[in-house]
Swiss-Prot record:
Its main location: cytoplasm. It comes from the Bacteria. GO terms for molecular function: metal ion binding. The gene is cheY. This is Chemotaxis protein CheY. Residues 7-124 form the Response regulatory domain. Binds 1 Mg(2+) ion per subunit. GO terms for cellular component: cytoplasm. It comes from Escherichia coli O6:H1 (strain CFT073 / ATCC 700928 / UPEC). InterPro entries: CheY-like_superfamily, Sig_transdc_resp-reg_receiver, ST_Response_Regulator. One of its GO terms (biological process) is chemotaxis. Involved in the transmission of sensory signals from the chemoreceptors to the flagellar motors. In its active (phosphorylated or acetylated) form, CheY exhibits enhanced binding to a switch component, FliM, at the flagellar motor which induces a change from counterclockwise to clockwise flagellar rotation. Phosphorylated by CheA or acetylated by acetyl-CoA synthetase, depending on which acetate metabolism pathway is available.
Amino acid sequence: MADKELKFLVVDDFSTMRRIVRNLLKELGFNNVEEAEDGLDALNKLQAGGYGFVISDWNMPNMDGLELLKTIRADGAMSALPVLMVTAEAKKENIIAAAQAGASGYVVKPFTAATLEEKLNKIFEKLGM
């Protein structure tokens, strides 16, 4: 089981969605959660350090989730950070693009708490967390 003190960054331009994900994480025992409203905001926070997991939307202003993912993977200090994409983009080509860019997992909105928990556990297991 993953460390319950693991620090999450939830990235979504829609504040209600950030709150939903934060509350679901809280239900799963993860209380160390911060938020960012787009990829640029997220990048600034991530570069300050201390985060152990990113949950990001795809469609956002300034820097979308795919660009954020590519930037994280290209940065030596952050390249191993797990990134779960949570998005309304359900098209096969989007899922493939996210996988090719290095997404740790992919969840299509709307989703249940059970789906989020299952994806997180798969990522934790794969990373030995």
